[in-house]
């Protein structure tokens, strides 16, 4: 169902269990030409790798309050957090928007560009109702692959980059440090 109530059958192109993202497709020939021309706008993907992203005003649309059609307005408060997943790491954009633990949707900058996909469960334990999002820059490649119906390569490793501090204090060599290997991974 589109925002104006128009309904159409959709098919699942691909889904990513790690991020909870899915790409669904609607056959264009099933939609009215006027509807396509006047009511559909393609979202522009921006960048979440902005140097001074903290303090950036944002609008959260979709389900940031846990109900369809809700929205919130605030700023990015931090982009220092990361979420390690199998074979990748996602940047987490934290906001000061009070939302729901069942939040979902999209985070836009004031130019109307998508800069994040809202996720739940990535907030600090003492800030569970603050809206957080995966940075869009890290997701662009995944979205493109899912849109093309491509599967993800999967090795089953969770790792981090070795920092200068870890190298000097712990003697860990520079490079990738494997924190975890998923059971039954290749």
Give the label of every model feature segment.
Residues 1-62, 66-67, 101, 153:
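Conserved active-site neighborhood of the chymotrypsin/trypsin-like protease fold
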Residues 4, 110-111, 186:
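Residue-level recognition of short loop/turn positions
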Residues 10, 110, 114-173:
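C-terminal cap/linker of serine protease catalytic domains
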Residues 11-14, 77, 158-160, 179:
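Conserved positions in beta-strands of structured domains
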Residues 15-20, 77-86, 162-167:
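Short, conserved beta-turn/loop elements at beta-strand boundaries and strand-helix junctions
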Residues 21, 52, 58, 73, ...:
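Extracytoplasmic/secreted envelope proteins and their assembly/folding machinery
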Residues 27-43, 70-132, 171-182:
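Active-site region of chymotrypsin-like
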Residues 48-88, 123-126, 145-146, 150:
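Flexible, gly/ser-rich surface segments that form the specificity/activation loops bordering the active-site cleft
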